[in-house]
Amino acid sequence: MKSYMAKPEEVKRKWFVIDAEGKVLGRLASQIAKILMGKHKPTYTPHVDTGDFVIVLNAEKIVLTGNKLEDKYYKYYTGYPGGLKEVQYKKLMQTKPEFVIYHAVKGMLPKNRLGRRMIKRLKVYRGSEHKHQAQKPEKLDIE
């Protein structure tokens, strides 16, 4: 008996909507990454992009456990000497809550071409409205 290998042209993609209100950031991000990779499907093949689309709503209402909102920093480098910048997650949650979820999920995906293709299927919105009604997304409940 041969092992099944999915072919890119055979992959059927679905759209899922996830409400992030009251969810813990890391736990939610790992579930989203699993869906983007396609690990929830029986046809999962590591070298083929078998994942689905994910729409995340209410990004501003996500929860960080402990004192991470005050203690955690997002660091980035501008490219200039002395250009290492730090932004506190509390401030980042006020200005760009979509980026917080995007950044957490991106860190859980493969660091190669496949991962770059997977992250393009993640759509994050603040508020409960999105512009993907035409795709008829399914509501997905994640604890």
UniProtKB/Swiss-Prot annotation:
UniProt KW keywords: Ribonucleoprotein, Ribosomal protein
NCBIfam families per the UniProt record, alphabetical: rplM_bact
Role of this protein: This protein is one of the early assembly proteins of the 50S ribosomal subunit, although it is not seen to bind rRNA by itself. It is important during the early stages of 50S assembly.
Cellular component aspect of the GO annotation: cytosolic large ribosomal subunit
Family: Belongs to the universal ribosomal protein uL13 family.
Pfam families linked: Ribosomal_L13 (PF00572)
PANTHER family per UniProt: LARGE RIBOSOMAL SUBUNIT PROTEIN UL13M, RIBOSOMAL PROTEIN L13
One GO molecular-function entry: mRNA binding
Subunit annotation: Part of the 50S ribosomal subunit.
GO terms, biological process: negative regulation of translation; translation
The protein, known as: Large ribosomal subunit protein uL13
Gene: rplM
